[in-house]
A protein has these predicted regions:
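Surface-exposed recognition segments
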Residues: 15-16, 63-148
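Proline-centered helix-kink/hinge sites
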Residues: 1-2, 54, 131
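Signature tryptophan residues that serve as conserved aromatic anchors
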Residues: 7, 33, 57, 67-69, ...
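Short, well-ordered junction/capping motifs at the entry into regular secondary structure
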Residues: 30-63, 79
Length: 148
C-alpha cells in the first residue's frame, strides 16, 4: 500500500488544485463515482475499475468509488510527520495510545461520512478509522516503486 504522501502525490498528478484536473467541480463526475452518480440514481456498491477517466498520469479511481487504506497512522496534521518511519508500518503493525487510528483516503461512492460528496473526494481529504474497520466502501490500492 502507498503511504499517505504517496497516495496524495498520485491523486494530484502534479497539481496543487483540489483535484488532478483542476478545481472545476462540474467535471468531477467524469473522474469519480460519487453519491450523485450512484446512490442518487439507484446504483449501490463499488463500480468497475476504470469506469471513469484517469488522471493525467493514467491512474483511475483515486476519487470516489471506494476509500483506500494507506500505511499511515492518523495524526490530525500529518505534514510534520511525513518522514517519520514509525507512522508507515502497515495495517498489521500494532497501534499505540498516541496514534490509535489509521488513515483512509479518496472518498467513496456512498454516503459514509461525507465520502460521496465533492468535498469528501478531494485530493487532500483524510478519514480516520480503527485498523479493524470493515466496510464495503473501503478498499486498498497496491503500490510499487518505479525504477529510476
Amino acid at each position: 500500500m502507498p503511504t499517505e504522501a504517496e497516495w496524495e502525490y498520485a491523486a494530484r498528478a502534479g497539481s496543487y488544485d483540489k483535484y488532478s484536473f483542476g478545481n472545476n467541480i462540474s467535471l468531477l463526475e467524469n473522474y469519480a463515482w460519487l453519491k450523485s452518480n450512484t446512490v442518487d440514481k439507484g446504483l449501490w456498491g463499488a463500480r468497475k475499475v476504470s469506469g471513469k477517466l484517469p488522471n493525467r498520469w493514467g491512474v483511475h479511481d483515486l476519487y470516489g468509488n471506494v476509500m483506500e487504506w494507506v500505511q499511515n497512522y492518523y495524526t490530525p496534521d500529518y505534514f510534520p510527520y511525513i518522514r517519520k518511519p514509525d507512522l508507515h508500518n502497515g495495517l498489521n503493525s500494532p497501534a499505540n495510545n498516541e496514534y490509535p487510528l489509521r488513515v483512509v483516503r479518496g472518498g467513496a461512492w456512498g454516503g459514509l461520512l461525507d465520502a460521496g460528496t465533492p468535498e469528501g473526494v478531494r485530493s487532500a481529504k483524510r478519514y480516520a478509522f480503527t485498523g479493524w474497520t470493515r466496510s464495503f466502501q473501503i478498499g486498498f490500492r497496491c503500490a510499487m516503486d518505479i525504477p529510476e
